[in-house]
Structure formats: C-alpha cells, structure tokens
Amino acid sequence: MPQTLSASDMVTPGSLSPPTTEPTDGEQAGQPLLDGAPSSASLETLIQHLVPTADYYPEKAYIFTFLLSSRLFIEPRELLARVCHLCIEQQQLDKPVLDKARVRKFGPKLLQLLAEWTETFPRDFQEESTIGQLKDVVGRIAPCDETYRKRMHQLLQALHQKLAALRQGPEGLVSADKPISYRTKPPASIHRELLGVCSDPYTLAQQLTHVELERLRHIGPEEFVQAFVNKDPLASTKPCFSDKTSHLEAYVKWFNRLCYLVATEICMPAKKKQRAQVIEFFIDVARECFNIGNFNSLMAIISGMNMSPVSRLKKTWAKVKTAKFFILEHQMDPTGNFCNYRTALRGAAHRSLTAHSSREKIVIPFFSLLIKDIYFLNEGCANRLPNGHVNFEKFLELAKQVGEFITWKQVECPFEQDPSITHYLSTAPIFSEDGLYLASYESESPENQTEKERWKSLRSSILGKT
C-alpha cells in the first residue's frame, strides 16, 4: 500500500589511525572496534581524528561516517569552524612566519578533506559563512604554495555547480502533485491514458528507472540522519532539521503517486476487458522492473494493484492471467521481514559490484523499507553511552547502510529518456482514495451492504447525488 513518511512508519567501515594527540576527557586510548576503529569516544576526540596533520590523514570511511553522524551532536557549520580552528592551532597558521616545509606536507591533506566534505555533503556549505571559513583557512596556507589557491578555486566552482543542480531538481520533485478527485470518469476522448503514451512494458520500466534515479540523485546522505534527529541531551543548540529532508520526503511521495497512478489507470476504463489489459500490462512492467533491479517501482506497482479499489474488481481479475503477478508478489512478500526481497536485493547488489555494463549496475531499493531499517537502527541503539561518549559503533553500521545507497544512486541511467513518458508519469491526473473507490464501484457494482453505503456516501460527497 502507499507509504507515509512518519517517524513511526519510516522506519565501508574503515580503519582509524589516530593522530598524535592524547585522549581527552579521561578516556582510555584504544577502545578497538573493527580494524582499529573505536567503538566509542568523546565528540572532541572524534573531531580531532577528523583533522589531518602533516603526517596523518583519516580513512575515507571514517570521514564519511563521522561527517554523516556528527550532525546529531553538532551543526555542520560549527563542526567546520572547529576543524578550521584545530588546523590553524596545530599547524600554527596564525603565526607571521610559517613552517613552509611542514605546511607543504599538510596543505594537500587539508584540501583533500575539504574536497571530500564538499563533494559528499554539499548542502553543509550553503551559507556564505561556511564558504568564508574555507577561504580563510586555505588562504593561510596559500603563501607556501600558490597551487593551493587554484585548487581552492576549483573546489568552490565544483561546489557551486553541485548546489545549483540540487536547487534546480527534476520535474515536480519537491512539490508533489496533489491527487485530483474526478467528479466522474472523464470521457475516453478527453482522458489520456498511459497505454496511449507507452504500450511497451520494457520501455515503461526503463522510463520508471529514469525517474527513480533522477529523484534519488537529489537525496543527500545527511537526510537519512536528519529525518530521525532528536535533540542531543548534551547539546546546547536546538535541532533545526525539520526543513532539511525535502528530497527524501518527495521521493516517498513519488512512491505514493506511482501507486495511485497504477490504480487510477486500472480503474479508469469502462470495460472490464480493457481493465484486465491494463492490469496485465502493469504485471509485465513490474516484471521488467524486477529484471532491471528497480525494486522501488516494482513495489509501487504491486501496491497499486493491491489497493482495495483495484483488488475488489473480481470480474476484471477473472480475465487476468495472474501467474506472473503471484510470482512477483512472492518476491516482495513482507513475510520474514521481506526475506525474499532482501535475497533478491543482495543478488542485484552483487551483480552491480561485478557489472560489465551500466545496465547491470542498477540497484534501486524498496525505499520505504530502507528508511524503516535505518529508523530501527537509530531507535535500537543509543547515540551516546552512559559515560557521555558517542556510540561510534552504531554510526559505522549507519554509514554502511547509507553508503551503499549513495553508491547505488550515483549510477548513470543507461536508458535514453523519453520526455513524453516521464512527463506523464510525473504530471498525469490521479484519483484520490475516495475517487478510486467511486471509480471502482462504477466499474463493478457494490457487492455487500458496506460497499453500498460507501458508494452512496461517495456519490453524495463527490458527485452531489443521493
């Protein structure tokens, strides 16, 4: 069924080589996790591990894990200020005379950290003050090597391009269409149906994949954390993340839209033979989505066909060859925490890792289940331990799940876009739930007293009839 985005429903770790600083806050050095990473540490120590020196650079996986999870405890702009301050302090960049040999070893590492940060979390740098901090710290090392200034210019140029692309977004990304309640089924001469736009299941599955990847591309990894953020008991600042998950929410709304679009297209035709043809068409589209690795569209199509206004059309379903549909339902069966789907997802992920073509790289997970997995990971483990240390072990697992998703969403779609099809998918009118029931009852009359009473109520509220 269509998904809602509420807290109740939404539900490559690397090694860490510590820099040459002493543990703080009385903590013991070396509380090892996998490959030497700490299972917990104070926030200050974790920040220190992020800061490069002339002889140290943090592991890439540590950088991603900490930048992803740190926003639960400290705002990104404040973290950047702390990192810049530590760099200036440790490398003595505020002195009138710099140790050029030391700075030349440190400079490339600092620029690499800033490049990784701006590349993976560009939204952390939307405020002018953060750009000013970048320019200030790089400006302090620039006298030692003029190429630093050039690299900084390239970094900022790439950042501005990323932010501009994120602001633009695909068609109808954030402001999802509100369902339209038809007063009655429009005449066939007026209503433009999907089969009139695209009658080939494989082509439609490809275009759905296009839409999915385009919308996925705009979801930042930080949105997974910000969707569930609670005020940290040791933090002094108020959480400010309620407006920072717009792309994640829009993607869940897209899933709902596709569910309702499928149901609308099925309930719209006047004749049961035509409705049966539409159902069989969507079964074939769903099968092609499965073969491609587009599990989100697959689940939306199955959910749309399982909506009550569609499933109650018994005379229509009697004309449908359902064997392929039952196979797909079995693959997405929620039994055993979606064990069949998870097996298929692992297979698609393995295929992606060993892919010889861009088509084989495609993995689009059932998104609401991914959100739910992350939600329960967040709810099941405390962010801090009783001693106040950050539970870094939890965030390694969080980063593993989010990092895998980031890899999948960066795949370039190998299918050529058909604007007429993708535009229809994003903008075609759809019934509301009440509109669907009314259309369903008009297609096949109510069978029991409950349905008759609902039909009468809908005719009164939507059509003004008694």
UniProtKB/Swiss-Prot annotation:
Gene3D superfamilies linked to this entry: Ras guanine-nucleotide exchange factors catalytic domain, Son of sevenless (SoS) protein Chain: S domain 1
GO molecular function, one term: guanyl-nucleotide exchange factor activity
SUPFAM superfamilies (UniProt xref): Ras GEF (SSF48366)
Residue ranges of every copy of the N-terminal Ras-GEF domain listed in the record: 34-164
Keywords: Guanine-nucleotide releasing factor
Keyword Repressor in record: no
Gene Ontology cellular-component terms listed: plasma membrane
GO biological process entries: Ras protein signal transduction
InterPro entries: Ras-like_GEF, Ras-like_Gua-exchang_fac_N, Ras_G-nucl-exch_fac_CS, Ras_GEF_dom_sf, RASGEF_cat_dom, RASGEF_cat_dom_sf
Its job: Guanine nucleotide exchange factor (GEF).
Protein's UniProt name: Ras-GEF domain-containing family member 1C
